[in-house]
Amino acid sequence: MLYSTYDLTAHLTPGTPAALGIALGNGWWSCGPPPGTSQPACGAAPPQLRLQLQVDGKPVLLSDASWRAAASAITYNSLYNGEHYDARTAAALAGWAAPGFDDAAWAHAVAATSAASAAQMSSALMEPTRHVSVRAPRSAHVPAGDAGAQVFDFGQNMAGVVRLTGLRCVAGANVTLRHAELLTHPPYGAEDGSLYVGNLRGAQATDVYTCRGDANGEDYTPHFTQHGFRYVEVRGAAVPLTDEQVAALEMHTDVQQHSSLAFSSARLNQLQHLVLWGQKSNIMSGVPTDCPQRDERRGWTGDVALTAEEAVLNYGMGAVYSRWLKQFADDQATDGGSNNFVPALGTADGSPNWQSAYPAIVWALYTYYGDRGAAEAHHNSLARYYDHLEQLYRASANLTAYAIGFGDWVPAGPMGNKHLIGAFALLRDLQMGADFFGGSRAAGALAQAARCRALLAAAAADFHVAFFDVAKGYYGSGLQTEQVLPLRLGIVPEPLRPKVLAHTIDDIVYTHSRHITSAIRTLTSTPTLSLAPAPAPTPAPSLYPHPYSSPCS
């Protein structure tokens, strides 16, 4: 269990009374996704506080049953579904965190007895998650046929919350804020200006503010939730809001961008812009997630296995990744395998290419930051992980029956050979292990590096025998994915490389009209093709009469 440390010195004055008030809400674990998941329902796991106040390094105050507690103005909160805030309760609790407040009617706190209360505490040792920027609306409109709603467009998908200021509403009225990344559009509905929330699935992404009826106006900023959105729909205000009263507060773990990349192409610059925003919007509470908006928002390892290099190049990820790696070690299965998402709900082996996140992060920190610390700190856990890979390899009938898992997730067309795709993960992991074990100073690291190199040589030979079609001159069934993976690994025999590469480029240009997509393929296609001379194309089929151009132009 992670804890945070705060220096309160600047908030204290000698001889002046001081009070400490803390608000607690549901976290990631409790009050989570819709029914059907393994997270507890709202209220089943009440929030807990563990606090120690030190003066000059000596404990002077601990959280115990002498503390007082009461229900707050936040009547409901969920990371996925939003927050409900009753400003009438807040008014009745005015001054609750200030000296002199009368808490005699409050109940005593109850000592926690759950397993979580005995969890080992560890310092977060990473940047905090905070509001990092404020964005004004770019435009606002009223959806067709819905005069009671206002939709504000912030012009950028982001993770965060929306702040309202100077809100005019009658006491007891509810003002709702619904969040979405898109407006309704065909084929999902008419372009009427309403929010499209189909991609949110079970996540409600709705904040509700119950007004106290202050004639001077009311302000609201959600406390214990976060949404992925570009648009917000506000409903229930007695007086329509102006753009100046609405602001988006961008949120993420406060990693700093430490590099920039610019092209002469506006399209490529926009692509890099999307990469930057997509990455930082998915670093929340130190966990790299799959999405900031729908009812998942978990630390899916496959996403990071593909993006760790990008992340460490664009942002200072050392602290976040180092802390997250500890959870990989905590959640490691008994056979050495890693999970499909971390933190995991139990220990189980994940899919090939998803498990690869563990070595991929260690390798990225070592390769781009020169950081040996992760490889050294995780040496034993990584050695068990490579024991697990070796067991999978030995049981795979020379890779022909290697573990499959998800394969090449969401391909634009047929799925490639899953055994081939799984075997790629094995070889990539072995390449990375040979690198970072080779640079580690941990006892036994050089022996681990030698093991990785030996297994890599054997598995590379098996890969070619198992998956290369000699008669047709390509791997597997000829799909792009099946070619770029061995090309990227550098395991295609040199005499065959030009033919495999030519087949790949022809497939990209003609079969898919210069289209490259899907998860694993995207990791490998562009870097592979950018290093290769483009061969002369074969004539394009009439279905795709496009003139040839380099696939990486």
What does each of the following model-derived ranges do?
Residues 296:
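Active-site-proximal alpha-helical scaffold in enzymes
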Residues 19, 28, 299-532, 540, ...:
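Active-site core of glycosidic bond-cleaving carbohydrate-active enzymes
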Residues 1-293, 302-303, 319-320, 339-344, ...:
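Extracellular/oxidizing-compartment recognition motifs
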